[in-house]
């Protein structure tokens, strides 16, 4: 998860040889940092507008990765919890599955803004916006070390990386915590 989350906000190496560093453009952010409010319906609508305005195919699955505090912020709004606006009984379930076309993914691994540490950076993105590459799959070995009184030694490794493929399909949403 950390590799994918980092790829959403980090500079992406682009170009034929990957020699150009491309930051997430400011137009792909719903608001500036130093927010005074958490995740709101207005911020969700803004993220949807940014994706729609970029001509992102509406048939692509859209996701929103956010933390527990952002879920709590939305559970306090009528639009999310009322059956008049949402077919899922979010308040009864205590979670949000989907809203405004976004499927919600709750994660405690999201970073805070480096400058404004009271802001959690959440992201809206499409299913093809981030690519994960696995160079070497998981290798795990457990053995004993005779030179260490036959202590158990655990070896575990894998090689992977992720990057943004299309900036216009990722939206950063800073939320106050």
Q: Residues of each region from the PLM?
A:
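Alpha-helical scaffold segments that mediate packing/assembly in large oligomeric complexes
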Residues: 1-53, 172-177
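Long, contiguous amphipathic alpha-helices that act as assembly "spine/axial" helices in icosahedral shell
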Residues: 1-20, 55-68, 104, 140-164
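Detector for Asparagine
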Residues: 9, 53-54, 86, 111
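Short, catalytically relevant binding-site loops at active-site mouths
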Residues: 13, 69-73, 110-112
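Sequence/fold signature of self-assembling virion shell proteins
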Residues: 25, 32-39, 77-177
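Hydrophobic, aromatic-enriched interface-forming segments
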Residues: 34-78
